[in-house]
């Protein structure tokens, strides 16, 4: 016996279970350290706290175990079990079942399950005192049960019972049908149910319990009648007022007549889930459970023996034990609550509480008189709440929370959360004082007992993150409904430790105790009235998107930053800044973009100034709500602070979009835009610019106003535009008033210094090239511990004491080229904080009394997790915050600011991020040439050399006195339109009959070049642009000089990549400048005409000029200003023409195509290789790859310059014959026919633009007239991937289908099997084709056909999609007997089955099982669900437009929706769709009657499709005259053939989906289909 006890104790110790003895009147206890046994992330507490231990009563001792092999749960299966109040134990491996219609009664007192027990439908409600599910146990019930007090048992000191305690395994409580119904009010006592029910299921014995805004805790009404399965009439209660819109009805008799769990005991029961239990509760009524009241927690206290920590000598029973809620879940991540009705009767703490769990809540109705509807304790890092309705009667006496006792959630909250991630979608909150209450725990690590209190998932540092971090907070609240019906009472107040709710009701209350730095909260698609957001985020950010706020909405509390996007307010939100903490006044930085603010008629809006540079407030003021229904502001330019050079022109633009087609829509004949300036006469600022009022007529075609603005003085302009009806007689009547962001006008700036980041490797270590997806990292600590020249961060970036860098720096190389352009390889290395949220500080020496322009280039690599990554920038310790939306993919950002340095020797720039945003480089510009104070050139050179060994960076000193320097960093807020230099018209074929005197043959050898590598970087230098900067402080960088643009241009720079590869020469230098001669403006942005025939100019600086410059260098250096640098007006980056780091290896010439026209022109001349030494002409490059180190951008113009040299003493004429423009690309040159003198070198520039995804391998003919020689220059360009395809890359196979539109082919594109829909150009509706291309290009979903691309040209019009091996659903179910074609008036464009390897042929119909049909229907519904979420109505849903990919019902994907030619995108302001499109037998009433329709038209079509698939008959086949179908559908008639033979649930779903009114959404349809499928499966 002693041996057995020893083994048992060892097993318990191994499992972490400790047995605790108690006084004899109590159950003995078991103790588990919940964090060690339940938290499976490999992290152990650093501090052992009492709440880490989990105690529970050992009620399973002395229970009766089942007889081995017994399967029926009856008395005889348990030896010597009593008839009533038995204490039973189902052993491990035993599987027992209660028989249907079995009456258990009071058979069970205590039931412990280590095996499994299943209670099927039909078992009479039974009683139970304690249900314990042990690890590995499984309890499943589809019938009701009641809790009762334990009989003849010891006392449970921890108050778990009566109730359920799970320690692992699974708990499934599943009801067979819905128990609650949503309803719309028809009258005080009449309602329309949103779900069809059987009227015969109810009689006068039933009661209808109604819950609404006026009856939060419900009222019971008499059941009168149900007509048509939808219309409910009640009586014997108060009428529901018309103001109530959220109405739910619960039918019940005395015995409920539904699946329920309630308590018949003297005290309520509770359900306690622990130990990673799998929980699924659905369609159950949890009634009057929950023991924990809303009073302060008073837990049971165990008094241990001083000499034995396993012996409890006394117990003080707690009066309010925590966590005894209706449902408490801890350490369980697979928890689903769906379509339940949870009602509590006492004033409880909360019916639902979660601790270190991630629950999914869907479609539940939660009614309570409690402190909170749901409480998420710490560790519950994700709550997914969808379509739930939370009704709450706030407590009359909320208690003061106790931080030390973890006592929270008493205020009357909807959701009370101590965790950072909250996701609510279309939830309803009724009656709560605070709908969402988020509270940070002060000193959270100490409370939880972890060094790093990680928000799930908690994981070690990756190459990007060097340590464990706390994730940012992300609140995603999408389309919720909030209703507060208690009025402005004062009986309920918030008594949080740091905030007091004096407004009675808040949408959101956020309490930041200072433990979490710099958090970003986001809200989306709110619609609220008389609500308030209260926040205490002195170092946090709140982002609000798509908010519609009426009445007196406001935001109160303290914020560091507020972002408002795409929202509508009745008044400007009165941001309250008077909330102080420790007596410190806290300020708010606000950005407001694309948002509407109501201003009453007669009131003039006051311009809201941005608090700091970078924040933008540009509301659209309106004084009539009907204006929003007429037209809205689509975009404005500029939309953020903008800078322009003096005397240059900027096009101020307002684009509108109409939102209705009524006759009240303003016409362009009477809408004008009045542009004026706002000057504050009281302001002390002397450089505010004033302009006279200018009226601009609205463009009738483009729907915009464009105001060309040119200012000839420096200063700031505050511009206001009033959009109004010029014929209006009311002085104060207008449509919109817009205050543009401040525009700054200044003189030309020039390049000053540049910094980039490169790695410093030890001389003893070899560098490895890493993948762009796996960046290498070198932390500060690692560098500091190494030797030799690798301690790059030791000295910061010191260069002549001009630059220092803080220690909190981690260097990462091989960042991805997020712009898909090799021109940005400068930005592929960067620095980020070692410690997240701790600043990286850079201190730069600058000259006094000058104005500087700074550019910071950041690369966002990849998300650390699914949460946001905000970026904060500080200048001289002052915040420089920009509106920075969430980023979920690699991206690139450029931030520009100006700094007037009056009397400082340096500037401090710092930034804060989570560790996934990298500062990759920085550029500094000034109005005047700036030089550092330094000694002679030798010492400067010495310092530079020294710094490259130990410092991180090198600052470029720019003191050249004879060469002009401009770095073309082209960045603008609107992405600058493309420069395209068009090819010359018709190529002239020049034939020279002069006899060649020196004939030689060329050899097919690989081309070579004498060009030396000018891209080598100094391996020991941390910060640099290129090594040319470092060679001589008095020498201008040649590469930057060659990138110079024409300084005389007053336009912002075009996005043209310009690369020069001309070799240097002792006597000559070449400065190329390609500037467009003709330009136009579109929408306020620069757009260069593609039809311009003007040539670009090439300026050639002679040696004479160079000599003059050299003779006067010392005198001109300090006097001459550098060329004007194009301004960087905002945060959006276009291409930057920088030097390339490397080139792709050359390929043999034979893969290049030669145009036939070129061959004809050159057929009579002799061919020579371009590098043949016998010909007098020498090319610096014979293969033009335009400097592409990677694939190029489509529609981007790239310019490449080479040099041609005449080695002989004879002049020659050269003719360049270019490939003819085609649909793939356009190439041109600045000089097609030219003379080259003896010994002369001449630059030639080529420009190319690719129009689609293609590989452009062409040859340019070069003819030497006098010698009758010719050669070729090869063009090698490959574009990035896009949806615009090259027709020549499509391989056509057999025809799959055809119609009047054209044909569908099976084919290949780049070895991928695809379907090619080839249109007959000129015979199809181009609008439908373009609409289909546009929609398919926007959407990606597994149940929507994948769009590969398209071909659009004068000759070809194709849509390329993925290929379906089986074919359409119509052909699958009907085969060759597809009769429905006779019922349609449209031609199907289905891709039919042509794959001989498939097991299913579409030549004949295939008999599908019910499971297969349901699986296909689920995929169709999921596809439609996604389309509707994207705002797309398909409008032609039918079997022929559903492609089948697999008929195995267990396959990942079985079906996909196709054919979007008739689809339509919608928006929330305009849903008046009346076009009659689609196929008649699938058209809803609204379409047939040409009435307004919405998403429900697809629901109706789905119902007909689903019906057709289930019965395998053509719909309406019982009607002989097909022309009668529309009138019958309009009258309410629906197909009946075979409908009654279907499964009841399937039949009901079809009836609901094609009902005349109140059709379900596809969210509900998917849910219903999945439930039906599971039943069949």
From Swiss-Prot:
Location of region: Disordered: 998-1019, 1050-1128
Compositionally biased residues, Low complexity: 1091-1115
Any single GO CC term annotated in Swiss-Prot or TrEMBL for this entry: membrane
Reactions this protein catalyses: L-seryl-[protein] + ATP = O-phospho-L-seryl-[protein] + ADP + H(+); L-threonyl-[protein] + ATP = O-phospho-L-threonyl-[protein] + ADP + H(+)
SUPFAM superfamilies documented for this protein: Protein kinase-like (PK-like)
Extracellular topological domain: 17-966
Pfam families: PK_Tyr_Ser-Thr
Protein name per UniProt: Probable serine/threonine-protein kinase gdt9
Topology, Cytoplasmic side: 988-1577
Gene: gdt9
Matches recorded under PROSITE patterns: PROTEIN_KINASE_DOM, PROTEIN_KINASE_ST
Transmembrane segment boundaries: 967-987
Lineage: Eukaryota, Amoebozoa, Evosea, Eumycetozoa, Dictyostelia
Ranges of biased composition (kind: Polar residues): 1050-1082
Residues that coordinate or bind ATP: 1296-1304, 1317
Biased composition (Basic and acidic residues): 998-1014
Entry-linked InterPro entries: GDT_regulator (IPR052015), Ig-like_fold (IPR013783), Kinase-like_dom_sf (IPR011009), Prot_kinase_dom (IPR000719), Ser-Thr/Tyr_kinase_cat_dom (IPR001245), Ser/Thr_kinase_AS (IPR008271), STKINASEGDT (IPR026237)
Stretch forming the signal peptide: 1-16
Keywords: ATP-binding, Kinase, Membrane, Nucleotide-binding, Serine/threonine-protein kinase, Signal, Transferase, Transmembrane, Transmembrane helix
UniProt main location, coarse: membrane
Protein's cellular compartments: Membrane
Source species, domain of life: Eukaryota
Keyword Transcription listed: no
GO biological process entries: regulation of developmental process
Active site: 1436
